[in-house]
């Protein structure tokens, strides 16, 4: 697991209070992890703070799974 993936997983576990074994790449924040719309906004803000990046609204709308977040953040931090 990449450093980005580990950091994303830690943030998701802390913000949503879910078991680590549920936080897998294809886990949907809302459908699988029980997040609501406010939770997803807070997750995006936490990702921005942790990785020192800005996630535009149009990109944030496409981040619906743990894997989506990891992929976006790996690209954003590699630039």
Swiss-Prot record:
Query: Which modifications occur after translation, per UniProt?
Result: 4'-phosphopantetheine is transferred from CoA to a specific serine of apo-ACP by AcpS. This modification is essential for activity because fatty acids are bound in thioester linkage to the sulfhydryl of the prosthetic group.
Query: What is the role of the protein in this entry?
Result: Carrier of the growing fatty acid chain in fatty acid biosynthesis.
Annotated protein name in UniProt: Acyl carrier protein
What protein family is recorded? Belongs to the acyl carrier protein (ACP) family.
Protein's pathway: Lipid metabolism; fatty acid biosynthesis
Spell out the molecular function terms from Gene Ontology: acyl binding; acyl carrier activity; phosphopantetheine binding
Query: Record keywords: Lipid biosynthesis included?
Result: yes
Q: Name one GO cellular component term.
A: membrane
Spell out the subcellular localization from the entry: Cytoplasm
Which SUPFAM superfamilies does the record match to this protein? ACP-like (SSF47336)
Q: Does the keyword DNA repair apply?
A: no
Keywords of the record, alphabetical order, are: Cytoplasm, Fatty acid biosynthesis, Fatty acid metabolism, Lipid biosynthesis, Lipid metabolism, Phosphopantetheine, Phosphoprotein
Supply the source organism for this entry: Methylocella silvestris (strain DSM 15510 / CIP 108128 / LMG 27833 / NCIMB 13906 / BL2)
Q: Which PANTHER family would you find in this protein's record?
A: ACYL CARRIER PROTEIN, CARRIER DOMAIN-CONTAINING PROTEIN
In terms of InterPro entries, this protein maps to:
ACP, ACP-like_sf, PKS_PP-bd, PP-bd_ACP, Ppantetheine_attach_site
Tell me where in this chain the Carrier domain is found.
Answer: 2-77
- Residues found modified as O-(pantetheine 4'-phosphoryl)serine: 37
**In which broad location class does this protein mainly occur, judging by the first location in its UniProt entry?**
cytoplasm
Pfam families given in the database record:
PP-binding (PF00550)
| Protein origin, superkingdom | Bacteria
**Which GO biological process annotations does it have?**
lipid A biosynthetic process
